[in-house]
Amino acid sequence: MKKEKNFFHLYMVSDATGETLISAGKAVASQYPTIQPIEHIYPMIRNKTQLQRVLDEIQREPGIVLYTIIDQEIKQLLSRECTKIGVPCAAVLDPVLNVFQSYLGTPKNLRVSAQHDLNTDYFRRIEALDFTIEHDDGQSSDDLFNADVILVGISRTSKTPTSIYLANRGIKTANVPLIPGIDLPKALLEEKNSLIIGLIASAERISHVRQNRELGKDVSIERYTDRVNIAEELTYAKRICERFGWPIIDVTRRSIEETAAAVFELLSRFREEKLREIL
């Protein structure tokens, strides 16, 4: 009987940056929480010499091999050598590309790093990050009209981390705090071209988060973390969102990624509606 290991080697070989592989590898590996993957990431593998170094590593420490490689010769060499070594080898994107080709009836245009066009995607993300950082926590509210998404909510409803996550996906995101007794920025109330979303959470979760964060504000700690007071803040936030017709996302049981996914869905609908208005 083989002795069970609590780890395995995971090789990710790409002719581009490897981001696609890393995401796929982590997603699948997370389904096996009791076994720790030892990740070996090899980006920009585009010739036999580079590949041979990878194969030498696989030979020394066998494991699962995932790859995204366009060049057929390099691809076949990797697959062939993995078979010789006796390790599983999978082309992550091939099944998806084949489905697209079959459905669209058009051969795929094989292009190395096509999914990472620096002239569009990379600089769009950088621009979005710059904008989001400048518009964190109600800053620079005069040009909110340049935002794709504006997140509003009381303190500690994950506005900032969600904004940064969205910015990393190229979405210009501003966030504005909702504070009872303090007027909302005029620009926010007048904004029609940005999607405005309210974030809420349970009073219990917000209280817990507030207790474990440095306040950084001149407020009473007891009042700031008191659940009754937080419930009143949440009621105020919900009324504001309802008054202006802003959709609400409850982040109580959502990760940042799950909250962002909900934002993307709302943004898609919002843009479709705007497009229909134009047409």
UniProtKB/Swiss-Prot annotation:
Keyword Transferase appears in the UniProt entry: yes
Catalytic activity, reaction form: N(tele)-phospho-L-histidyl/L-threonyl-[pyruvate, phosphate dikinase] + ADP = N(tele)-phospho-L-histidyl/O-phospho-L-threonyl-[pyruvate, phosphate dikinase] + AMP + H(+); N(tele)-phospho-L-histidyl/O-phospho-L-threonyl-[pyruvate, phosphate dikinase] + phosphate + H(+) = N(tele)-phospho-L-histidyl/L-threonyl-[pyruvate, phosphate dikinase] + diphosphate
GO molecular function: ADP binding; ATP binding; phosphotransferase activity, phosphate group as acceptor; protein serine/threonine kinase activity
Organism domain of life: Bacteria
Keyword Transferase set for record: yes
Cystine bridges: none
Keywords: Kinase, Nucleotide-binding, Serine/threonine-protein kinase, Transferase
Documented EC number(s): 2.7.11.32, 2.7.4.27
Function according to Swiss-Prot or TrEMBL: Bifunctional serine/threonine kinase and phosphorylase involved in the regulation of the pyruvate, phosphate dikinase (PPDK) by catalyzing its phosphorylation/dephosphorylation.
Protein name per its UniProtKB record: Putative pyruvate, phosphate dikinase regulatory protein
